[in-house]
């Protein structure tokens, strides 16, 4: 299972939102490239970028930072947030990104997902962000009537590389991933699933190993890394060794 550090970009800075709320912002760094290089130094094999400005408004405010990171890093970089057209997706891929993540457009224009997946094999990922089992769009500001698992089942047949499953209720809370929702997503999907949201300690990461046989092949970690609750290098080693344990019996689940 791959541990993927996240850098969320808002007006050029590295931030985290609490449960997707743009009014609850924690800023961690004003130098996204330096932060990205730090994760590489600690052993990251892939980097996950989120353009929060793009997700909310569709404006490419963070493109300078994105292009610099894609150019300078020696590992694959993927980006989501505001990718809602064929032109935008191809522009990002041409600047050196390994993958682009489609969110809102996957509901509003599923034909575009299929076209991009056909034109760019292994480069297109769908991000399914869910609140109470239903997909949220446009930077989590709007909610749809589409069930997350139904969307996963449908789009996983479109030739995409993977699905990123984000549980909004746990994102940025450090309260632990929603294992039940992830299990349902993995069972519905025909492509690998990457978990996102809620990881607060090493035990949370290890608990995800139980879902690996179902197709959960990666996990995106944000706030727990920035808060120092998870050491990236140690986590990568632990996952590689497959140290599966019962998270309920692990003292490290306490986040207070």
Swiss-Prot record:
Q: Gene3D superfamilies given for it?
A: Aldolase class I
E.C. no: 5.3.1.16
Superkingdom of the organism of origin:
Bacteria
Which cysteines pair up through disulfides? They are: none
Q: What molecular functions are annotated in GO for this chain?
A: 1-(5-phosphoribosyl)-5-[(5-phosphoribosylamino)methylideneamino]imidazole-4-carboxamide isomerase activity
Q: Which ranges form a coiled coil?
A: none
* Pathway noted in the entry: Amino-acid biosynthesis; L-histidine biosynthesis; L-histidine from 5-phospho-alpha-D-ribose 1-diphosphate: step 4/9
Cell compartments where the protein resides: Cytoplasm
- One GO cellular component term noted in the UniProt record for this chain: cytoplasm
Concerning InterPro entries, the annotation shows: Aldolase_TIM, His_biosynth, HisA_bact_arch, Isoase_HisA-like, Isoase_HisA-like_bact, RibuloseP-bd_barrel
Q: Which UniProt keywords apply?
A: Amino-acid biosynthesis, Cytoplasm, Histidine biosynthesis, Isomerase
Q: Which GO terms describe its biological process?
A: L-histidine biosynthetic process; L-tryptophan biosynthetic process
Catalytic activity of the protein? 1-(5-phospho-beta-D-ribosyl)-5-[(5-phospho-beta-D-ribosylamino)methylideneamino]imidazole-4-carboxamide = 5-[(5-phospho-1-deoxy-D-ribulos-1-ylimino)methylamino]-1-(5-phospho-beta-D-ribosyl)imidazole-4-carboxamide
Annotated catalytic residues: 8, 129
Where does this chain mainly localize? cytoplasm
Q: Which family does it belong to?
A: Belongs to the HisA/HisF family.
Q: Which PANTHER family match?
A: 1-(5-PHOSPHORIBOSYL)-5-[(5-PHOSPHORIBOSYLAMINO)METHYLIDENEAMINO] IMIDAZOLE-4-CARBOXAMIDE ISOMERASE
Q: What is this protein called?
A: 1-(5-phosphoribosyl)-5-[(5-phosphoribosylamino)methylideneamino] imidazole-4-carboxamide isomerase
């Amino acid at each position: 299972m791959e541990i993927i550090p996240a850098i969320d970009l808002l007006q050029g800075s590295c931030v985290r939102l609490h449960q997707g709320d743009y009014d609850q912002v924690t800023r961690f760094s004003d130098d996204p490239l330096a932060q990205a290089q730090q994760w590489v130094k600690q052993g990251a094999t892939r980097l996950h970028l989120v353009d929060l400005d793009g997700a909310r408004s569709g404006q490419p405010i963070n493109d300078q930072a994105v292009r610099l990171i894609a150019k300078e890093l020696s590992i694959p970089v993927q980006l989501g947030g505001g990718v809602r057209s064929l032109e935008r997706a191809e522009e990002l891929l041409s600047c050196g990104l390994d993958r682009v993540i489609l969110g809102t457009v996957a509901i509003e224009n599923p034909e575009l997902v299929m076209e991009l997946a056909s034109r760019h094999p292994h480069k297109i990922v769908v991000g399914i962000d869910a609140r109470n089992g239903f997909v949220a769009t446009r930077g989590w500001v709007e909610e749809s009537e589409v069930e997350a698992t139904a969307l996963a089942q449908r789009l996983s047949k479109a030739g995409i590389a993977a699905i990123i499953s984000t549980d909004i209720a746990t994102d940025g809370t450090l309260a632990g991933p929603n294992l039940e929702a992830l299990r349902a997503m993995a069972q519905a999907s025909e492509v690998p699933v990457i978990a996102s949201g809620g990881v607060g300690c090493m035990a949370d990461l290890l608990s995800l190993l139980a879902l690996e046989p179902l197709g959960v092949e990666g996990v995106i970690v944000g706030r727990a890394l920035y808060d120092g609750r998870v050491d990236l290098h140690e986590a990568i080693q632990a996952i590689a060794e497959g140290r599966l344990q019962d998270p309920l019996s692990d003292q490290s689940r306490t986040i207070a």
